[in-house]
């Protein structure tokens, strides 16, 4: 009897929720109704009913074993503004113990609902939530290619790319080629901007600056006006009038010294008198290393090949199998038969 009363009261609450005639759930002029229904006849069915949004108030409402709607309505809080759709979930226990509960009505909000299908839900922005659409769980790092240049970054993070930061042995990195030409033409040292370093600020960089790539860069100072005097001894000798030519061939300075174009316009002030080592033939010397060489691959021609005593298996013919098959059958050997010298002579003559 108590169960029937409970089921009857629950059915009334469900009807009041579905038809919108309840006192505490009457929609106002600014209230929007989201219509969604779902029913799966399983052991623990799930039914989703529409929820009324009171202004900017959002709160998930869940019915477990037919909880009174008035109690759940009291749990609505007006805290936060997010973009989402809140559904009233009704868990129906279809086991043997609760089969006496009333069935779910075939209409929700006076609209015929197919209990075996999931209807479409409406997603709309709430009023006053234009500034905050999604709540950021964490600030994205610049290494994930989706960060913001104005977001505060860690000192070890690079600038908007997945890459390895330069080592900490030098605080600055050489500027780009246009900046070096600017320093060379104007005669100003240290006026060029530097790339974002671990000790620098990623925001205060030039617009044309490139971020650190995915390989570790050389972070030596880019002003080669004073550095080039020390590295002059490793450049081509002074007898080469044209810089970048060696043995009448173009030396790949752009591949070896691509980090600085200032070396292309620099002349040698003196001959270091360093003799190269003649270790191998046709070896080239790099412009920035003294003993770094490269070996070439050449064709080899074979002449006057003499074969001395080839192996029996390497004789010309159909193969080693043919040599065995062409042998005559072995005669009987032993007392009363062919002697050993005659047998060996016959074998040799057959070959």
From Swiss-Prot:
Domain of life: Bacteria
Keywords for this protein: Herbicide resistance
Region annotation (Disordered) ranges: 1-29
Start-end of Basic and acidic residues biased regions: 1-18
A Gene Ontology biological process term: response to herbicide
Function of the molecule: Confers an increase in glyphosate resistance when expressed in E.coli.
Miscellaneous field: PG2982 is able to utilize glyphosate and other phosphonate compounds as a sole phosphorus source; it can grow in over 100 mM glyphosate.
Protein name: Increased glyphosate resistance protein
Gene: igrA
